[in-house]
Amino acid sequence: MSSFGYRTLTVALFALICCPGSDEKVFEVHVRPKKLAVEPKASLEVNCSTTCNQPEVGGLETSLDKILLDEQAQWKHYLVSNISHDTVLQCHFTCSGKQESMNSNVSVYQPPRQVILTLQPTLVAVGKSFTIECRVPTVEPLDSLTLFLFRGNETLHNQTFGKAAPALQEATATFNSTADREDGHRNFSCLAVLDLISRGGNIFQEHSAPKMLEIYEPVSDSQMVIIVTVVSVLLSLFVTSVLLCFIFGQHLRQQRMGTYGVRAAWRRLPQAFRP
């Protein structure tokens, strides 16, 4: 055997002795579901499995309550209960001394069950501003929530919320608008959409009850002057007609009763109507 062949054989034997697992297949760990959104205090069934034929050890790591429902050599089925907050479940298996793991992300949500719309003020003059406010109590996660404000079928405003927003607070969206003549015939409403598709959940929607504005035309200064003048003239005519009727009545009475009767009537006349 040549020296080159001898060296090649030596290297091959060394590799077999020092690296016995170099040809060993890499195994995988799977978890079902990979992600899911649940309501508070819910329970969830989780399946952990592996491609390793004879795993040495395996299981599910979580701080929540768990029960092993069933198992075989390559899989374990658990019930996780009392889920009250977002959490990560970790499935793991060890095969030939090597450990692999896979995580399942669980999100806790509360859907929008009540959407409250407020118009302030409800009586608005044409051209004046008013505020539309939408409130949704106790909804989470807020970063998956969007509030839409509508005037009829027109979207006036949409409001999203960042991840930094605290959970289980009241979500609020406001929008300032200017009233026009047609607003008195339009419905205002709010739509809350909680989109949990990216978290392994569904889309939840809730509408507010529709509200309407009372719209009126503002009175200009010149119109106000005309109204005040007309009212003053009418009031003066009314007072004058009352005085004329009184004087005419007393004149007729004087003709019937004489001077004495007129003087007596004059004394009975209130001071306000005397010249």
From Swiss-Prot:
InterPro entries: ICAM, ICAM_N, ICAM_VCAM, ICAM_VCAM_N, Ig-like_dom_sf, Ig-like_fold. Residues 249-275 are cytoplasmic. Glycans are attached at residues 47, 82, 105, 153, 158, 176, 187. Residues 251-275 are annotated as: Required for interaction with EZR, MSN and RDX and co-localization to microvilli. The gene is ICAM2. ICAM proteins are ligands for the leukocyte adhesion protein LFA-1 (integrin alpha-L/beta-2). ICAM2 may play a role in lymphocyte recirculation by blocking LFA-1-dependent cell adhesion. It mediates adhesive interactions important for antigen-specific immune response, NK-cell mediated clearance, lymphocyte recirculation, and other cellular interactions important for immune response and surveillance. One of its GO terms (biological process) is cell-cell adhesion. One of its GO terms (cellular component) is plasma membrane. Residues 25-223 are extracellular. CDD domains: IgI_N_ICAM-2 (cd20995). The chain crosses the membrane at residues 224-248. Belongs to the immunoglobulin superfamily. ICAM family. It is found in: Membrane; Cell projection, Microvillus. Its main location: membrane. SUPFAM superfamilies: Immunoglobulin. GO terms for molecular function: integrin binding. Keywords: Cell adhesion, Cell projection, Disulfide bond, Glycoprotein, Immunoglobulin domain, Membrane, Repeat, Signal, Transmembrane, Transmembrane helix. It is a single-pass type I membrane protein. This is Intercellular adhesion molecule 2.
